[in-house]
C-alpha cells in the first residue's frame, strides 16, 4: 500500500502549473488532496480534471497574502477530515523581469514579498499546528534556483526565494523534535502550460541554461515533492533539493 493512502495533503497555488502537477501526483499515489488558489472556479476546474468524483481532490479558495484566509483554510481542512499530514507551500508569483533594483516599483516589490514569503510564513504559522494535531508530518516549501543564486533584473523574486530557504531551515530546527520535517525544493525552468505558450526562442534559451539542455517536467518536480512528503525521506529536514538539471552546480 502506498504511503499516501489515508493521508491528507494541502497544496497551495495548485490551480495551474507546478502545483497542479504536484496535486495530480499525490492523488495518483492515494492521498486526499486539498488544493487552493485565489480563483475558486479555476481551482474547482482543476480539482475536477484530476478527480472527477470530487471525493479525493477538494478545491478551496484562499489568498495566501491574507492570514485570515489562510487560517480559515486550515480550519476547514481539519473540520472536513480531522487531520493534515502534509503541506506543500507552492503559491508564488515572479513579479517584473529585467528590472533594475533602482527602477523596481515599490508596490510590485511588496506584492512579490507578500505572496512568495509572507504566504509561506502564513502557511507555516497555521499549518504546523494542524500537522501537530495530526501527530506530525512533512512540509515542502517551493523555493527556486533563485533561492541559492542571484540573478540580475528579478531582485524581488530572488530575495523572496532566498527567504523561503531561510524560513525552511528555521522551521525545520524548531519542530524537528515534534515529528515535523520541513524541506525546500528549487526547480529550474519547468515546462508548464504557461511556459509552452512562450515563443520558441525563449523556450530554447530557458532550456539552454540547464546543463541537461532541457526544462524540467512537472512530473519530475512532483516526484521530488512526493519523496519529501513520504517516509522515504524520514531523516531529511532543513534541506534544499535542486530539481534544475545541474543549473546550480555550475
Map each language-model feature to its residues:
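Alpha-helical segment proximal to the catalytic Tyr-Lys
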Residues: 129, 173-177, 234
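Catalytic Tyr-X3-Lys loop
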Residues: 102-121, 140, 164, 212
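Substrate-binding pocket helix/loop in short-chain dehydrogenase/reductase
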Residues: 98-101, 105-110, 195, 206
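C-terminal substrate-recognition "lid" of short-chain dehydrogenase/reductases
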Residues: 3, 124, 214-243, 247-248
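Active-site helix of classical SDR
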Residues: 124, 160, 168
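The beta1-alpha1 cofactor-binding region of Rossmann-like NAD(H)/NADP(H)-dependent oxidoreductases
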Residues: 40, 61-73, 106, 219-220
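Residue(s) in the substrate-gating loop at a strand-loop-helix junction
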Residues: 144
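Conserved glycine-rich cofactor-binding loop
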Residues: 8, 15-17, 39
Amino acid at each position: 500500500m502506498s504511503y499516501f493512502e489515508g493521508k491528507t495533503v494541502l497544496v497551495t497555488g495548485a490551480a495551474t502549473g507546478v502545483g497542479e502537477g504536484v496535486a495530480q501526483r499525490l492523488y495518483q499515489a492515494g492521498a486526499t488532496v486539498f488544493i487552493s488558489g485565489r480563483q475558486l472556479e479555476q481551482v474547482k476546474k482543476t480539482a475536477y480534471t484530476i478527480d472527477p468524483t470530487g471525493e479525493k481532490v477538494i478545491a478551496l479558495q484562499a489568498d495566501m497574502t491574507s492570514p485570515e484566509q489562510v487560517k480559515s483554510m486550515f480550519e476547514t481542512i481539519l473540520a472536513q477530515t480531522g487531520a493534515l499530514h502534509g503541506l506543500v507551500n507552492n503559491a508564488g508569483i515572479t513579479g517584473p523581469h529585467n528590472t533594475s533594483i533602482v527602477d523596481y516599483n515599490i508596490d510590485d516589490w511588496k506584492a512579490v514579498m507578500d505572496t512568495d514569503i509572507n504566504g509561506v510564513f502564513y502557511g507555516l504559522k497555521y499549518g504546523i499546528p494542524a500537522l501537530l494535531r495530526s501527530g506530525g508530518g512533512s512540509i515542502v516549501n517551493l523555493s527556486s534556483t533563485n533561492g541559492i543564486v542571484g540573478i540580475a533584473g528579478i531582485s524581488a523574486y530572488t530575495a523572496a526565494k532566498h527567504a523561503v530557504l531561510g524560513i525552511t531551515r528555521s522551521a525545520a530546527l524548531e519542530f524537528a523534535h515534534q515529528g515535523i520535517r520541513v524541506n525546500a525544493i528549487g526547480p529550474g525552468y519547468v515546462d508548464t502550460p504557461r511556459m509552452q505558450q512562450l515563443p520558441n526562442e525563449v523556450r530554447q534559451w530557458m532550456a539552454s541554461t540547464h546543463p541537461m539542455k532541457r526544462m524540467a517536467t512537472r512530473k519530475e518536480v512532483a516526484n521530488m515533492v512526493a519523496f519529501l512528503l513520504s517516509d522515504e525521506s524520514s531523516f531529511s529536514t532543513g534541506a534544499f533539493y535542486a530539481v534544475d538539471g545541474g543549473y546550480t552546480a555550475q
